[in-house]
């Protein structure tokens, strides 16, 4: 069962499951996902993870043996204005899901966590052991989610792992696009479509070109590691409690802007705006443990990420 399987990331996970010969059923409220993202062969149960009866019925009807939990409220900045909603969806929702799993004897979960659990780390390379210091209700809710899995494992023997990912971009198939109004790629593409100039917030950071450096990963690479984690849990093989899915090498915002201009053929000079408060110069993670256990690797270049995202965005904006 894939919660949030009609969303941008969840839909890629579902396709990776199908490509590996596994079956899936999706539970998604469709509050930010799209029914059109769901393959025809995959059952879609439209409903909330806060509905325990619906979850138990879905587990019974479809013979669910494990869960990949992608559903949740994912906007770190907005979570500051909506803390109760964030905790309800991400903490209460995860607890309700775990209760339904326990009631039906389902003992395997792959949890989509986030780099937001680290906050603003004071290190050039984030590892799984980097101190956790979330700085938003979203980051806090994801860390609590990891704790819920840990405590449930002690109490019931739940087999689990959490995948912490950073900036997810690109598209595995043109039909699946990132519609978030808060993520960098959609913001750039939206600005270009409206004839506006994309903005860079600060060009005076202590980085090679003065702009923020972040860890960008392709959504298809991320999806493959979710499937690898699920397969290891199915096989009873050991997994770490959490893995960072990082490249080990960051990309600057200026590099992304230049690649976007090259791919789209739209020449532009980004507008330089003041720094945003609390925006760190660099956040990059190692993916060594995930490479060892979860078939994790960066199979896609920055150009691949931009090209696939641009293609999917253009397709989504065309009239049907």
Model-derived segments and spans:
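Short, flexible, glycine-rich and Lys/Arg-enriched loop motifs at helix boundaries
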Residues: 35, 166-184, 194-216
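C-terminal substrate-binding subdomain of Rossmann-fold SDR/epimerase-dehydratase oxidoreductases
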Residues: 192-320
């Amino acid at each position: 069962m894939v919660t949030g399987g009609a969303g941008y990331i969840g839909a890629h996970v579902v396709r990776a499951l199908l490509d590996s010969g596994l079956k899936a059923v999706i539970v998604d409220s469709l509050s930010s996902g799209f029914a059109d993202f769901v393959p025809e062969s995959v059952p879609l149960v439209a409903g909330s993870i806060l509905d325990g009866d619906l979850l138990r019925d879905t587990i019974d009807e479809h013979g669910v043996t494990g869960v990949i939990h992608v559903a949740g409220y994912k906007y770190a900045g907005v979570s500051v204005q909506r803390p109760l909603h964030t905790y309800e969806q991400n903490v209460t929702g995860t607890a309700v899901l775990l209760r339904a799993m326990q009631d039906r004897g389902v003992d395997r979960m792959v949890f989509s966590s986030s780099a937001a659990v680290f906050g603003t780390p004071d290190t050039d390379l984030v590892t799984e052991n980097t101190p956790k210091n979330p700085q938003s209700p979203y980051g806090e809710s994801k860390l609590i989610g990891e704790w819920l899995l840990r405590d449930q494992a002690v109490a019931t023997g739940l087999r689990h792992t959490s995948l912490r990912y950073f900036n997810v971009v690109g598209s595995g198939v043109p039909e699946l696009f990132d519609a978030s109004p808060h993520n960098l790629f959609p913001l750039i593409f939206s600005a270009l479509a409206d004839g506006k100039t994309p903005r860079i917030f600060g060009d005076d950071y202590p980085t090679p070109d003065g702009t923020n450096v972040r860890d960008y990963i392709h959504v298809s690479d991320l999806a493959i590691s979710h499937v690898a984690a699920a397969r290891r849990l199915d096989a009873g093989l050991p997994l770490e409690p959490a893995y960072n899915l990082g490249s080990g090498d960051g990309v600057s915002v200026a590099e992304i802007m230049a690649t976007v201009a090259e791919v789209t053929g739209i020449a532009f000079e980004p507008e330089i705006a003041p720094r945003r408060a609390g925006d760190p110069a660099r956040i990059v993670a190692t993916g060594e443990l995930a490479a060892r256990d979860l078939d994790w690797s960066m199979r896609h270049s920055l150009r691949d990420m931009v090209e696939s995202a641009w293609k999917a965005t253009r397709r989504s904006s065309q009239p049907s």
